[in-house]
Structure formats: C-alpha cells, structure tokens
Design a protein with these regions (language model features):
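Helix-turn-helix repeat elements of alpha-solenoid scaffolds
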Residues: 31-46, 78-86, 119-120
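Short coil/turn linking the two alpha-helices of tandem helical-hairpin repeats
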Residues: 34, 67-76, 112-117, 154
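TPR/TPR-like (Sel1-like) alpha-helical repeat modules
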Residues: 80, 84-87, 118-136, 165-166
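Terminal, low-structured helical/coil segments at or just beyond the last alpha-helical repeat
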Residues: 130-166
C-alpha cells in the first residue's frame, strides 16, 4: 500500500513537472514577447523553475538572463547578466552546434551588446552558420523569425539580404 502511494506521488510529481516545462515554441513566443521588464522578469522566473534538460531550454534560459540587462539600471548587473547569459547559450551551442535557434539567440544578444564590452565575438560565425543552413530549416516559423531579424538588422550585407528575401 505504501509502495503504491509512493508510485502515485512520483507519477503526480512527474506530470506536474511536465506541465510546468515550457516547450520550444512556447519559449520562442515568450522570448519574442519580452518587450518590457515585467514580461522579461516573468519569463525568467518561469524558466528558472524548469530543470534545463535540453540545450534549447539552456539557451533560452541564457537568452532571457542576458535580456534582463536591457532593463537593469545597474551597470555591473547589466554586464553580468550579459556575460552569464551568453555563457549559458554558448554551452548549449557546444553540444548542439547546428541548432539554428540557439545560434539565433546568441546572435540576437551579441549583436545588441555594445562592441566595447567585447562580448560580440560570435556574431560572424553565428551569422554564417545561419545563412548556410537556413534554407534547409524545416520549422517555417523559426525560419521566418530568423530571416526577419537578419533582414531588419545591420548584420547582413545587401547580397546576403537578397539571398534571405528570395
């Protein structure tokens, strides 16, 4: 009887943690919606509750941490949010080097950090890997998000933008 009860509790806890876990699309949509400090903080708190078992979860955890820098008034906190967030994204990329979504996340963060901070050293590599592989990306929504970002940024040359637009 006690064994059955323990199994039911373990099953309930597993289901509860599954329901709290955010899927890739939900994380993507929530990240795209991080337009205020409150939304960003809410996303950060929610993603902290999950145990990042997948590289994409680790990547989004790092991206939202880095994004918190945008809303912090403290320069040291801004720097540390970016540094720690980029470190998390880079660790995820080490194990999933061709995941375009992870490359996109790092590219978004690094391309928006002032160059004098020295944290934008992966921009060229990430851009190149994305440009080389975006044509074969099966996720249409992700492809559209990445293409739109690149077309509206100053990261790509006119030639690269023409290739993306076609």
């Amino acid at each position: 009887n006690a064994g059955k009860r323990r199994n039911r509790i373990a099953t309930f806890q597993s289901l509860q943690s599954l329901s709290q876990a955010m899927g890739r699309i939900e994380m993507r949509n929530t990240f795209q919606a991080c337009s205020t400090a409150a939304i960003t903080e809410s996303f950060h708190n929610r993603i902290l509750k999950s145990n990042p078992s997948k590289d994409i979860e680790q990547g989004y955890r790092g991206a939202v941490l880095a994004l918190k820098a945008k809303y912090s008034a403290n320069p040291l906190k801004k720097y540390n949010y970016c540094k720690d967030g980029l470190s998390m994204i880079s660790k995820a990329i080490e194990t999933s080097p061709y995941d375009l979504e992870l490359r996109y996340l790092r590219l978004v963060i690094e391309s928006n950090i002032p160059a004098f901070l020295g944290m934008n050293y992966n921009v060229k590599d990430d851009k190149q890997i994305i440009l080389n592989n975006i044509g074969s990306e099966q996720d249409v929504n992700l492809k559209q998000i990445i293409s739109s970002f690149l077309l509206n940024s100053n990261i790509c040359t006119d030639k690269e933008k023409k290739m993306l637009a076609s």
